[in-house]
Amino acid sequence: SEEQSYLLNAVNSFLKNQKAFSRFDDVGIDGVLIVDAPGEYSLKDLGISNANIVSISLVSPTTTKERTKKICNASSGFIYYVTLKGVTGSSNVDLEEIKSNVIDLQKNTDLPVMAGFGIKNKEQAESISKVADGVVIGSYLVESIFQAKKTTDYKKIYNYLSEIKSVINK
C-alpha cells in the first residue's frame, strides 16, 4: 500500500499560511485534519484551497447520525473514527462497540474509515483492522518516542510497529 502524509493542525495555522498550504502537495503532503473545525465544513468552506489536498474528518461515538452524514459528505480523504469517549491515549477501548460503529459508519460513506484513539497493542489493532480500512496509533507511539533514551528503546519501537503492521496487513 502506498504511504501517505497528513498534517494535523488548527484552522488558523492553515489560514495564516495559505501560500504554504497551496504548495503542500509539492512537498508530499496528501491531506489535512483540522482539529478545531466542525467536521461538516469542507476545506473550501473554511477558505482554504488546494485541489490536491484531501480533508480528513473526525466522527466520534457520540456524533449523531444526521451530523455523521454531513461530516461524511464534507470529507474528501477519509473518515477518522474516534474509538472512545474521552481523550486520546485513554485505555477504555470496547472492541465490539468500535467494530459495530465502524460498520455503521461505512454505510454512510464510500471513503475509507480509519479508527484510532486509545489503540495501544497488536490485539486491538488486529481486531479493529478486520472492519476498519486502517488503524491509527498516535499517543502511544509519541509517548514511546519521547520516553526513548537509548538505541535499544528505538529498536523496541521499531519492533512494536513491525508487529502492528504484520497483524493489520493480513
Q: What is each stretch, according to the model?
A:
Residues N101-L111, K120-K170:
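Alpha/beta catalytic cores of nucleotide-metabolism and tRNA/nucleoside-modifying enzymes
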